[in-house]
Amino acid sequence: MIDRLDRRRRGLPRVLPALFVLLLVVLVGGCKGLVEDVGGGGGRAPADLETSAAERAAWPDPPKDAVSAKVQRVSDGDTFVATVGGRRERIRVIGVDTPESVDPNQPDEPYGQEASDFAKHYLNGETVRLAGDAEPRDRYGRMLAYVWLRDGTFWNALLAAEGYAQQLTIPPNVTYAPLFRRLVAQARRNHRGLWAEENKHQASS
């Protein structure tokens, strides 16, 4: 009996390292999964989006001359302040238009606050990539840009596809106009975002 206990005790040092390694693998794997769930695009898990990962992967990648920018503050769904090349710039995304939510003298437009919250969730404090079109700035002096999130998602397209924006085509800045037109039409057809609100208003009238 004593002999058997001694043998078991002598076997413990061999078993403990193996158990420790197994526990470490489980913990690291769990942490990796958590990071992947909240990575890219400001922390929102892809499961919260209406569009699939495959759909988003098919959208254009940032061009080689895209520049890096650090988002400082989101004004509303389609406008934010960022540091670009050491300068503070107001950025207006090209090709889409979200409902207004920043004028203190006017009531928010339907779905304006939701669009603003969506942008804050994805952009605040994030590093993004910017690319321009034919005109570098609008009449208000804002930098016009196509925007890509740090995971490569085309932000302008995401706003359109998720139902947070309508198309706004202002020539000559029309590089991705056909894409935005298609995505807005799909969002409207699928009653996403502001288009669901539109259906509610139509049903109640």
Task: Give the positions of each predicted feature.
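Small beta-barrel nucleic-acid-binding modules, primarily SNase/OB-fold domains
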Residues: 2-205
